[in-house]
Amino acid sequence: MPRTHAIEDYRNFGIMAHIDAGKTTTTERILYYTGKSHKIGEVHDGAATMDWMTQEQERGITITSAATTAFWSGKRLNIIDTPGHVDFTIEVERSLRVLDGAVCVLDGNQGVEPQTETVWRQADKYNVPRIVFVNKMDKTGADFYRCVEMIIDRVAGNPVCCQLPIGSENNFKGIIDLVRMKAVVWEDEALGAKFHDEEIPADLADKAAEYRNKLVEAAVELDDDAMAAYLDGQEPDEATLKRLIRLAVVGRKFNPVFCGSAFKNKGVQPLLDAVVDYLPSPIDRGAIKGIDFKTEEETVRKPSDEEPLSVLAFKIMDDPFVGTITFCRIYSGVMEAGMGLLNSTRDKRERVGRMLLMHANNREDIKEAYAGDIVALAGLKEVRTGDTLCDPAKAVILEKMEFPEPVIEIAIEPKSKADQEKLGIALSKLAAEDPSFRVSTDHESGQTILKGMGELHLDIKVDILKRTYKVDANIGAPQVAYRETLTKKTEVDYTHKKQTGGTGQFARVKFTVEPNEAGKGFEFESAIIGGAVPKEYIPGVQKGLESVLGAGVIAGFPVVDVKVTLTDGAFHEVDSSALAFEIASRAGFREALQKGGSVLLEPIMKVEVVTPEDYTGSVIGDLNSRRGQIQGQDMRGNANVVNAMVPLANMFGYVNTLRSFSQGRATFTMQFDHYEQVPSNVAQEVQAKYA
């Protein structure tokens, strides 16, 4: 099937916002007015089209960004709905990576909220052009002008109004279009489908003229001819003004602001017009950078069907009907069902099975997809989020996505053997779908450890395990991975002798045990000369030493960074064996750990807190109370960044503490940095708990 829309007519955009700002409702209205939904789904009653997982419909929040295709004014819209909760930031990050533009939805009452700040910063990171929609103008306390001020104060944005509201709260009737200088009023009884132009109300004429001037002045600055004409007293016409606003959005010079009430069906059609008029097409965003698979030199792929195929996999989902679905953005070339691809990130071959166009959780099979398309592929074997798929003959690796390290972990134990099998399958699927969710096995306890971005993140994973995969399991409290090591060099001479009639056991070992460099782990070497311990018994010595590493003498934690040198020993022609030397070295090593001043080590995390300036003092005070060491602070935009080293043991519950004292406006990232000796008073508490 040939291309239905030129690539210039594509708008790949996301809808981003804080939780509860009305993002999903806005998307629902867009789908309704573009003819994709026959009935309007409401978040309140759990019927929203885009929120299709049970967990989303119950909690009224969007967890997975569903992709959908719609059409408006002859343009093709690929819309990605993103979650607004801080624990699902990863979903937002990967959506922004593949979008060309975004609509930032604000709650007319709350304005720029904490997650709006986080998402805005992420959009800055990926240079995503955006327009702003001030939603919920019908809500008590809605204040359009305060929201505009907050865009400047909180996210250092550059808002320019393209619309003003007519009335607010219960009296919100419509908008003033500052480009056309007309009032647009909606008729209540027609579900927002009917609206008409009127003259601007007399009481708003002055305000409209003032904001129209601000808009025109901001726009003409981008074009010398328009500026010259304006200075000569000539206002730009509607087409010129729209062209200049588009230039401003694509070049990220300013953020046009629109308003309405998605719930009351007002303002959605002009917002769709703004998406079409102002947000960039793939052509506006230009070529994407990558690395040539063979030469490893930088290369680019232009947004064109004529270029070699390059595709980025940005989301993987397990679909109950189709199996594994991989959401992809095609940056260049044409993809056909059945064609062979190279996963250049992993150097693995793949074949395109079914190609699907997604509408929330409905799907339509297609045979071909083109540059600019966002499609879902079924049946790919080894693709992970962030992988590049491409033409094997002209292979390229596109820029990789970056994923934050998980900051919280819990242990999970299946209740039965059947649950154990189901758990293994379920966890491998969940980990493939979500790169910020990690699964590992604790070798000391044998427990399965789940790691995620926050408590809600892990709650929802556990909920999916129980409901979708029917796994019955016990969930443990979060734990810290302590370690043990030596502080001084010591020497041990140990003899193992056992006589029980017949062949006995005999082995003597003499070794030095000393601290190794941090991070070097365990090292063993033999300095035996002259056969005091025969060669065939030395592996037995090493095996005995290694068997002690799993559990130290303080509280049974793994032993790290120790060097053992075998210096001497003795054997018996008949009674010695590899097993006897293994037993001797095991007992001797434990003795050395007792004598060598064993200490506890704890993981130290590198913590970065991004906070509005008002809360900096509270952040620093709180980190100090957690045995943290402040490394420094600097400014980022209009936010303060505090860097610190803090023991992991003191970081549990931090996400909730930080959220509460900063009203959720501060965010933090945390990653492992190094192990450090535990202070003696804390070591005694740990010993009492675990020994």
From Swiss-Prot:
According to its UniProt entry, the protein's GO biological process terms are: ribosome disassembly
Tell me which domain of life the UniProt entry assigns to the organism this sequence originates from.
Bacteria
* UniProt keyword terms in alphabetical order: Cytoplasm, Elongation factor, GTP-binding, Nucleotide-binding, Protein biosynthesis
Q: Where does it sit, as one GO cellular component term?
A: cytoplasm
Kindly provide the name given to this protein in its UniProt entry. Answer: Elongation factor G
Q: Which residues bind GTP?
A: 17-24, 81-85, 135-138
Q: What does this protein do?
A: Catalyzes the GTP-dependent ribosomal translocation step during translation elongation. During this step, the ribosome changes from the pre-translocational (PRE) to the post-translocational (POST) state as the newly formed A-site-bound peptidyl-tRNA and P-site-bound deacylated tRNA move to the P and E sites, respectively. Catalyzes the coordinated movement of the two tRNA molecules, the mRNA and conformational changes in the ribosome.
> Which Pfam family would be a valid example here?
EFG_III
State the family it belongs to.
Answer: Belongs to the TRAFAC class translation factor GTPase superfamily. Classic translation factor GTPase family. EF-G/EF-2 subfamily.
Organism source for this protein? Azorhizobium caulinodans (strain ATCC 43989 / DSM 5975 / JCM 20966 / LMG 6465 / NBRC 14845 / NCIMB 13405 / ORS 571)
The answer to whether UniProt assigns keyword GTP-binding to this entry is yes
- Where does the UniProt annotation locate this protein? Cytoplasm
Q: Does the keyword DNA repair apply?
A: no
- InterPro entries per the record? EFG_II, EFG_III, EFG_III/V, EFG_IV, EFG_V, EFG_V-like, EFTu-like_2, G_TR_CS
Domain (tr-type G) spans: 8-283
GO molecular function annotations of the record: GTP binding; GTPase activity; guanosine tetraphosphate binding; translation elongation factor activity
